[in-house]
Amino acid sequence: MADSLLLLKRVPSRHTWLRARKARPQLMLSRRPRRRLRNLRWRSRRRLRRRLLQAQAAGADWLQGGCLVSGDAALQRLKTSARRRASSPEPAEDPVPSGPAILPIPPVRPAGSGRAVLLLPLGQGFTFSGICCVTCLYGQVQVFGFTISQGQPAQNVFSTYTHSRLTINAVHYSVHEKSKKEMKREARVLLRPYLNQDDRYCLMSSFSPLCSIVLLERLKTSTVNFIISHPGLSYIFVQEVRTFQINSEYFALRSVGIRREKKKTGLRLTESAFAVMEELVSISSEEADSCPVILVCGCQDIGKSTFNRYLINQLLNSVSCVDYLECDLGQTEFTPPGCISLLNITEPVLGPPFTHQRTPQKMVYYGKTSCKNNFENYIEVIKYVFSSYKRESPLIINTMGWVADQGLLLLIDLIRLLSPSHVVQFSSDRSKYMPDLTPDFVDDMDGLYTRRRSRVRNRGFHLPEFAESLEFADEEKEGPVMSTGYKLMFVKSEFVTGKTSRNRESHNRILRELAVLGYLSQLQPPVPKPLRALHGLTPYQVPFNAVALRIIHADVAPTHILYAVNASWVGLCKILDDVRGYASGPILLAQSPICDCVGFGICRGIDMEKKLYHILTPVPPEELRHVNCLLVGAVNIPQCVLKSQGGLEGTIPYVTTDYNFKLPGASEKIGARESGATYKEKGHPKPKFYRKTY
């Protein structure tokens, strides 16, 4: 008896897993877990077994001494502990929300070759990488802010590795008075053409009210095929990653051409961004005559372009058209780089810029990816393009990420000239300081070409009634005076990017080259026809005396002008001057014109004997009849286009290692190569690698 009492006193001091072992039977594992258990190390195996035993014994009530408590005694003890908690002065815990629990996503079911069916419970999201065609068979889903409902056309979705992964979210939708049985019967009928009986039964076992069913199909486009045909660019859409979860869902998604990703890799917007978008969408849809002009500004790599795409898709859910004014020369959204354009967007934007190159309503080829050397021409081009806006649809204005020093003054000029109704200003903890662009701040600041609303000298007293009677000097009267009245909206950004000060320029250059490739893909025949090499396509022959020439970004001697045009990216433009009166050419312009640009092309050759330019372009012939000017800027043909010319023997045309840097304009022609060489000569210290600790 004494020994038993002594044992009872020692029991509480023992470890929990020892008590669990005595109270419960020995843990039985199946064959596969036992095999995994043998492969673990001794310490990991011991830790795993302890956790399993603790989980197995979690439901047992303990009494000092190791004996189980009867049901009545356990109930009495629970009531006693509840009374103690009620009488305790400590604050109560937060109540658990009483809303319905979010159900898990069932496995994706194969629906034939290159097709799969996905069931999403309400509130769940499917994050993926790759490209596919999304059709909503039942319910309603949202991708990148655009809502896809049952019966609507399929949408091409591009979730690339150059940007954040996209997510298919199941959203709430209105249901007429139907029982769960009727909804289930309707969904089963819709699934009959796609799934066999067994897969249909397994999928419908996870059916719940307000869930959505999506059909994922393999997507093949000439744009994707053309981009991945170049060496080193296939990783943009598909990346083979080693996985340990090889099951039926893995093979079903692989046949579609996508891969399931973790939720944390998907696109995430802050609450402030959603609040701003909700207000802007409400203003655009509820008021019939309201066409807000929304200017989005902030420093670079803070998420402005992502916000603009999401906002466009949100607006297209309620309005038929959204206008878009592109003022960012380096990272354009719908055109090749170096352009200022105005577009009418009627289709959702479900991918990065190089997947949705479109024809603008009005476009001017500025010819550079930055305006730092010619602010006045930049302002004049924006005024020229903005004059075509008819105020029939909401307008989104995208601005540059240069908001320091002169860039801030230039932004103030844009706000005054474009007169937006709403200004969305982005900020983050890691971005440089940017003042709040309130209407009062803008009115009290001088821009580069506009001046503040009032310039009253401070004479030691404040008498606003005498402000109009004061006389100013001539230099104080220069520049137009424009007052602003808009609503300032703030977005706190938590956008995470892999760009740094060292790799930002190379990263941006890759995105610009992808945009050019996306534009050139319009030369390819539609799928399923095979791709054709660019040097195998028939170019247009343009006489010297039919078009004028101008090099925008540099001063080139007239004797070397054709060297600069050959094998260059050219803008096909329309000028008001008549150039048909010249007997021979080339015809050179003395200054860069501000004129309409109908598209772009490649000057793949010049015939000096017949005096012909050979132009390769996707612009239709009816538009080419009006082209009478070729503009050459700092935007170059991607190197992969020149290097990957198949079917050629010997040296590749336009690719050489012997280059004369003394030619006028030679340094501007290869500015990117020079900057890369300068970067290597600086001798930056090698990056240090640290081991991660957990």
Swiss-Prot record:
EC number: 2.7.1.78
A single MF term (Gene Ontology): polynucleotide 5'-hydroxyl-kinase activity
GO cellular component, one term: nucleus
Major site of localization recorded for this protein: nucleus
InterPro entries given in the database record: Clp1/Grc3 (IPR045116), CLP1_P (IPR032319), P-loop_NTPase (IPR027417)
Keywords, sorted A to Z: Acetylation, ATP-binding, Isopeptide bond, Kinase, Nucleotide-binding, Nucleus, RNA-binding, rRNA processing, Transferase, Ubl conjugation
UniProt entry tagged with the keyword Transferase: yes
Pfam families: CLP1_P (PF16575), Cupin_NOL9 (PF24419), NOL9_C (PF25467)
Keyword Nuclease tagged: no
Post-translational modification N-acetylalanine, affected residues: 2
Localization annotation: Nucleus; Nucleus, Nucleolus
Principal EC category: transferase
Motif stretch (Nucleolar localization signal): 31-47
UniProt-annotated binding residues for ATP: 298-305
Record-annotated disulphide pairs: none
Catalytic activities: a 5'-end dephospho-2'-deoxyribonucleoside-DNA + ATP = a 5'-end 5'-phospho-2'-deoxyribonucleoside-DNA + ADP + H(+); a 5'-end dephospho-ribonucleoside-RNA + ATP = a 5'-end 5'-phospho-ribonucleoside-RNA + ADP + H(+)
Region listing for Interaction with LAS1L, in residue ranges: 472-694
Family note: Belongs to the Clp1 family. NOL9/GRC3 subfamily.
Chain's role: Polynucleotide kinase that can phosphorylate the 5'-hydroxyl groups of single-stranded and double-stranded RNA and DNA substrates. Involved in rRNA processing and its kinase activity is required for the processing of the 32S precursor into 5.8S and 28S rRNAs, more specifically for the generation of the major 5.8S(S) form. Required for the efficient pre-rRNA processing of internal transcribed spacer 2 (ITS2). Associates with LAS1L to form an ITS2 pre-rRNA endonuclease-kinase complex and is responsible for the transport of this complex into the nucleolus.
Subunit structure: Interacts with PELP1, WDR18 and SENP3. Interacts with LAS1L to form an ITS2 pre-rRNA endonuclease-kinase complex.
Protein name: Polynucleotide 5'-hydroxyl-kinase NOL9
Organism of derivation: Bos taurus
The gene coding this protein: NOL9
